[in-house]
Amino acid sequence: MTMMSDLSQDLLEEILSRVPRTSLGAVRSTCKRWNTLFKDRILCKAEETRDQFRFIMKKYKLCSMRFDLNGTLNEDGGTEFVDPSIKELGHFFNQVKISKVFQCDGLLLCVTKEDNIRLVVWNPYLGQIRWIESGNTNYRLFDRYAIGYDNNRKHKILRFLEYYNFNMKHRFLEYEIYDFSSNSWRVLDIAPRWEIESYQRGASLKGNTYFIAKEKIEYEEDGEFPEPADNLLCFDFTTESFGQFLPLPFQHYLYDVGALSSLGDEKLAALFQCGDTDLSEVEIWVTTLTETNTVSWNPFLKVDMEPHYGRSFMFDYYGGSFFIDEEKKLAVVFQFDESGMTRYEDATYIIGENGYVKKVRLGEAPANQGGYCFPSVCFSSYVPSLVQINQIVGFKKEREEE
């Protein structure tokens, strides 16, 4: 009878490479040898060429997804195929609906969709979750978040608190940061000179988060001011501050489509589509250098959508979720489509060189009373993380006794 100890190193690595990422934690406990392989992240070369693993939001549920682009752009005229294998996650995700998700370093920060909004951080690799108690102010529907880490690899959560004081007739914006090591929130002394739209989720890179933002201008009732173009803005989790404005590779204004995505932990990608209905081109750029206060861009793709869907086709300016495959020279853009007055669906548009466009339907999507639903959100390829985020026992009790 063959024992696990009898298996060759190559065979073990091949077996482990086929384990779903959401099941890695359970497999690690099988034996010490397998656990060591996982800790060293020794995965076979076959995995490097396999379809990448990602997470996607669908019907307010977090799902795992393998988006197989093999066969796309066949030059021999053969049948194209795209296999977006989507599987709803089990565990505690069966009990809650999720409205927003943010990721960094293999950790997922989830915002629940319920009257009493909650935050939870999940490490899919270790199978650990951690509920994040709010600070002095309860979580609100339009709060914005980012997750990252500092130079000491200490993980933190940034929170934007935006609210309107009707007595003062003024909108306030405050920033808080949560430190995993101290299990507490702190208010940051930041006087924003910029505005970041609520639908801009940002992109994580090297522990920091980058946003599309515009200069903040105080408008007078009778005054007329030109609308400032958007810029790139980085939040540094080490200094716990925002940097200076950095250039985007295009002029982006309100109602233009603009979104960011990260490529592993090395590059940013930016998607742009002008809001002018006479212009239907989609542009994607990739950074060649990305630091807190320095950035440079190279063009990646430019595709005209008019020949396929007409001049009026526009991606959602409040969505813009996408990822790219540099090797295949492809981009996959996620879209919330209105297929009728009462029917909505999630879809992806695969775009490539020489005007290539292919739509892949992902199924029906829910709509709320206003007809608006956050579109599907997909992240770059997931990389397992060994970051421990076990729930701190007694933390909630300590807060209640304060």
Swiss-Prot record:
SUPFAM superfamilies: F-box domain (SSF81383), Galactose oxidase, central domain (SSF50965). It comes from the Eukaryota. InterPro entries: F-box-assoc_dom_typ1 (IPR006527), F-box-assoc_interact_dom (IPR017451), F-box-like_dom_sf (IPR036047), F-box_dom (IPR001810), Gal_Oxase/kelch_b-propeller (IPR011043), SCF_F-box_component (IPR050796). Transmembrane segments: none annotated. Residues 1-56 form the F-box domain. NCBIfam families: F_box_assoc_1 (TIGR01640). This is Putative F-box protein At3g20030. It comes from Arabidopsis thaliana (Mouse-ear cress).
